[in-house]
Swiss-Prot record:
This is ATP-dependent Clp protease proteolytic subunit. One of its GO terms (biological process) is protein quality control for misfolded or incompletely synthesized proteins. PROSITE patterns: CLP_PROTEASE_HIS, CLP_PROTEASE_SER. Residues 74-96 are annotated as: Disordered. Its EC number is 3.4.21.92. This gene contains one large insertion sequence (IS1) that divides the clpP gene into two sequence domains. The insertion sequence forms a continuous open reading frame with its upstream and downstream sequence domains. InterPro entries: ClpP, ClpP/crotonase-like_dom_sf, ClpP/TepA, ClpP_His_AS, ClpP_Ser_AS. It catalyses: Hydrolysis of proteins to small peptides in the presence of ATP and magnesium. alpha-casein is the usual test substrate. In the absence of ATP, only oligopeptides shorter than five residues are hydrolyzed (such as succinyl-Leu-Tyr-|-NHMec, and Leu-Tyr-Leu-|-Tyr-Trp, in which cleavage of the -Tyr-|-Leu- and -Tyr-|-Trp bonds also occurs). The gene is clpP.
Length: 524
C-alpha cells in the first residue's frame, strides 16, 4: 500500500468485528466507491459485491414499506380523500385530466430518455447504411440484372419523417417526372390489370405469359406504378343498398354464406333504425332517473349516522386530508415530497474514478452493478478514465456523470493473447469479437450514438479530452467549483446519515464489551 493512503475503521454490522479499511480501493461509508488503481479481479469483486448488497438492502426496505401500507398501519395523509374543490374541478374537466404522478413515478420515469427520438434516429441510420451499401455494390453489378435491388433502393430513398403527409407516403415514389408521367399514363394501369388477370388464369402451357410474369415482374410493374393516395373509401357504407341488391339477386341465395351475410346486414339495419332521437331521449331519461335514485339513497344513508357526528369528529381528525384547506394541504404535500427526495438522495452511490483500466470483463461487471442502484449513481472522473474505467464512468446515471477539466478518457477494443490449438484460438477469437460488440452496445446506449460509429472509434486507441468526452456522450458536465460544491453537499448528507449509524454500532459494541468485562470481573 502506498504511503499516505488514509485508512478508517468501519463496522459492517452488529455481528461482524470492526476493521481497518483502505478508502482508495474499497467502499467508504457504504455509498462511496474509489476506483483509483488497476481494476483487477479482487477490486472488482469487492465493489460489485457491496453494490449488490446495497441494492438488496434498499429493495428489502421497499418491500417492508409496501407490506406496512398493505396491512393498513401508519397510512400517510396523502392517501386520504380529495377535497371538494379538487373534486369539482375534476368533474368540470370531465375526467380528461391525467392522474397526478407520485414522487417515485417521477424519479423512475423514462420520459427524459427520448426513446421515440432514438428509435427514429436508428431508423435513419439503418436506412443510410443500407443505401451506402447499395451504392458501393452498384459498381460490381447492374440494377437491371437484379430488379429487387432497384426496388429496394427506391424504398430506401423514401422520407419516413413524421411531418410528412400521409398521402405522400406512397409505396413507390412519384417525386421524379418519369414516375409522375407513368402514373398519369392509363396504359400502365391497363397493363397492370391485364397481367393480374393472366396471373389468376395462369396455365402451364402459355409461354408468353411466363416471359411476362417471371419472378421479378411485380417489382418491374410496381416501379412504374406510383399512386398518390392509398386511402381507399370503404365500399360498404350504404348497408341498405347492399341489402336490397343481395336480396334481388337469385343466383347465390341458396348458399349458406350469402344467407348469413344477408342476416347480418339486416340486423345492422334494424339496429340503426332503432337509434332514433325519441328512443335515445327515453333511454337517457331512464339512466338519469337511476342515477338520481342512487344519489338519494347514498345521501339518506350518510345523513342517518355519518353526517351527525362529522362536525364533532372534525376537530379531532387531524389526519383527514379533506378537512385541511388548500394552503396547509400544499405545504404538507411539499414537505412529504422534500422528505422523499432527500431519502432518495441519501441512497445514491458516488464513484470517484482515476484509473488506467483493467480487464474488460471487470469493467462490464462494474457497469452492470451500477445499474442495480435504483436511486442512481454519480460518477466523477479525476485525471484518467481509460479502457475499462471508461465503462464505469459511462455506467453512471445519465445527467450525473462528471469529469474534471484536466481529465482524459480513452476507449479501445478488447485485446488479449491467445495460445493453444488452432481450433481453440478460433473459438476464443470469436468470443473476443462478441465481447467487442457488447462493449460497443454499452457505449452506444450511454452516448446515444449508433453502434457502427462506436465500432469504428474502437478500432484503435481513441483518446478524448474533457470537452470531447462531453461531446462524445461519455460524460455530461465538467466538474467546476459549483458542481463540486453540490457534490460535496450530497456526499455530506450520505456521510451524516451513515455517521449516525456507525456511532450507534460502535456504542452498542462498546456496551457489549463493557458488560462482558464486568461479568468477567465479578466471576473472578
Amino acid at each position: 500500500m502506498p504511503i499516505g493512503v488514509p485508512r478508517i475503521i468501519y463496522c459492517w454490522g452488529e455481528e461482524l468485528p470492526a476493521q481497518w479499511t483502505d478508502i482508495y480501493n474499497f467502499i467508504f461509508r457504504r455509498r462511496m466507491v474509489f476506483l483509483m488503481q488497476y481494476l483487477d479481479d479482487e477490486l472488482c469483486n469487492q465493489i460489485c459485491g457491496l453494490l449488490i448488497n446495497i441494492h438488496m438492502e434498499d429493495r428489502s426496505k421497499e418491500l417492508e414499506k409496501k407490506e406496512m401500507e398493505k396491512s393498513g398501519l401508519f397510512k400517510s395523509g396523502t392517501a386520504k380523500t380529495k377535497g371538494k374543490d379538487t373534486v369539482k374541478k375534476e368533474n368540470l374537466s370531465g375526467g380528461a385530466s391525467a392522474k397526478r404522478q407520485s414522487v417515485e413515478d417521477l424519479l423512475t420515469s423514462d420520459n427524459d430518455f427520448g426513446i421515440e427520438e432514438n428509435h427514429l434516429l436508428e431508423q435513419y441510420t439503418l436506412q443510410k447504411i443500407t443505401t451506402e451499401w447499395l451504392n458501393w455494390n452498384a459498381q460490381f453489378f447492374d440494377y437491371s440484372d437484379e430488379p429487387y435491388l432497384y426496388y429496394l433502393a427506391d424504398i430506401l430513398s423514401k422520407d419516413f419523417s413524421p411531418n410528412q403527409d400521409k398521402d405522400s407516403a406512397n409505396l413507390n415514389f412519384a417525386k421524379s417526372s418519369a414516375n409522375k408521367q407513368a402514373f398519369q399514363n392509363p396504359a400502365e394501369m391497363t397493363k397492370l390489370i391485364k397481367n393480374l388477370k393472366n396471373l389468376k388464369n395462369f396455365s402451364t402451357g402459355s409461354k408468353n405469359v411466363k416471359q411476362n410474369l417471371d419472378v421479378y415482374s411485380p417489382f418491374r410493374l410496381l416501379a412504374n406504378f406510383a399512386p398518390q393516395n392509398y386511402n381507399l373509401e370503404h365500399p360498404n357504407q350504404n348497408l341498405a343498398e347492399i341489402y336490397s341488391l343481395l336480396k334481388t339477386s337469385t343466383q347465390n341465395t341458396n348458399q349458406p354464406f350469402t344467407k348469413k351475410l344477408i342476416d347480418n346486414l339486416s340486423h345492422k339495419e334494424l339496429m340503426n333504425r332503432l337509434q332514433s332521437p325519441e328512443k335515445l331521449v327515453a333511454s337517457s331519461e331512464k339512466a338519469l332517473g337511476r342515477r338520481r335514485l342512487k344519489q338519494r339513497y347514498v345521501q339518506e344513508r350518510l345523513g342517518s349516522g355519518g353526517l351527525s357526528n362529522s362536525k364533532a369528529l372534525k376537530a379531532y381528525n387531524y389526519l383527514d386530508q379533506g378537512a385541511l384547506n388548500n394552503e396547509s394541504g400544499r405545504s404538507l404535500y411539499r414537505k412529504q415530497t422534500e422528505r422523499v427526495i432527500q431519502e432518495e438522495e441519501s441512497k445514491k452511490v458516488f464513484m470517484i474514478i482515476n484509473s488506467f483500466g483493467g480487464s474488460v470483463g471487470n469493467g462490464i461487471t462494474v457497469h452492470d452493478a451500477l445499474q442495480f442502484i435504483k436511486a442512481g449513481s454519480l460518477t466523477l472522473a479525476l485525471g484518467v478514465a481509460a479502457s475499462a474505467a471508461s465503462l464505469a464512468l459511462a455506467g453512471g446515471t445519465i445527467g450525473e456523470r462528471y469529469v474534471t477539466e484536466g481529465c482524459h478518457t480513452m476507449i479501445h477494443q478488447p485485446e488479449g493473447g491467445l495460445n493453444g490449438q488452432a481450433s481453440d484460438i478460433w473459438i476464443d477469437s470469436q468470443e473476443i469479437m462478441k465481447i467487442r460488440l457488447d462493449v460497443a452496445e454499452i457505449y452506444s446506449l450511454s452516448t446515444y450514438r449508433p453502434r457502427h460509429k462506436i465500432l469504428r472509434d474502437l478500432d484503435r486507441d481513441f483518446y478524448l479530452t474533457a470537452m470531447e468526452t462531453i461531446y462524445y456522450g461519455l460524460a455530461d458536465e465538467i466538474a467546476t467549483n459549483e458542481v463540486m460544491h453540490s457534490i460535496v453537499e450530497m456526499t455530506n448528507q450520505v456521510w451524516s446519515y451513515h455517521d449516525s449509524k456507525q456511532e450507534r454500532l460502535l456504542e452498542s459494541r462498546a456496551s457489549l464489551v463493557g458488560d462482558s468485562t464486568q461479568t468477567q470481573e465479578s466471576n473472578s
